[in-house]
Amino acid sequence: MTLIALILPAYLLGSISFGVLASRFFQLPDPRTYGSGNPGATNVLRSGKKSAAIFTLLGDGGKGWLAVALAEYSAPLLELGNEAVAAAALGVFLGHLFPVFLHFKGGKGVATALGILLGFNPWMGLLAATIWLAVALMWRFSSLAAIVAASLAPFYALFFLGFEARTLVVFIMSLLLIWRHKSNIAGLIAGSESRIGKRSTS
């Protein structure tokens, strides 16, 4: 029951889509209706409104960090350890991917995963962000940057965290994140994948 008390609020927090909220605030089309149909920062950027994309990025990343921070504060009070923090992290990530408020059709989890990594260990999060940024700047594909960063994440989780529950969650998140990019992988292979900053024509 104590774990559920951490997981459920984390899942509900993860279910908040900042891409949809930002689009409503800036009076933009729903991001689920154009581009990739994904309510994440990269697709919101295709609206041409950079401020909305930044809001989405900070919101989606912030909820991942917040879930971890709250769990780290609450776990000792509930006489729980890192397994509780790991459970909350997985809860907020699954909430983003399968949000109850959007009929379980959410984003791909890149920003939320980054927020979680920053919460687990700031250096680990910064390393992930640096890898993403380097790949994105070199090839201009957000999806490729996410896939590369996700593929490497379990290795630097082992380095910074060792063998423990949070490392297992990083591994699970990496698999889910890559799986959520399966259509992007097909696009990269076919040469039809959209580059960062390309505005939607739909």
Swiss-Prot record:
Top-rank taxon: Bacteria
Entry keyword annotation includes Lipid biosynthesis: yes
A GO CC term attached to the entry: plasma membrane
Metabolic or biological pathway: Lipid metabolism; phospholipid metabolism
Transmembrane regions listed in the UniProt entry: 1-21, 84-104, 116-136, 143-163
Broad class of enzyme this protein falls into: transferase
UniProt keyword annotations, A-Z: Cell inner membrane, Cell membrane, Lipid biosynthesis, Lipid metabolism, Membrane, Phospholipid biosynthesis, Phospholipid metabolism, Transferase, Transmembrane, Transmembrane helix
EC number: 2.3.1.275
A biological process from GO: phospholipid biosynthetic process
Family named by the database record: Belongs to the PlsY family.
PANTHER family per the UniProt record, alphabetical: GLYCEROL-3-PHOSPHATE ACYLTRANSFERASE-RELATED, INNER MEMBRANE PROTEIN YGIH
Designated name of the protein: Glycerol-3-phosphate acyltransferase
Organism: Nitrosospira multiformis (strain ATCC 25196 / NCIMB 11849 / C 71)
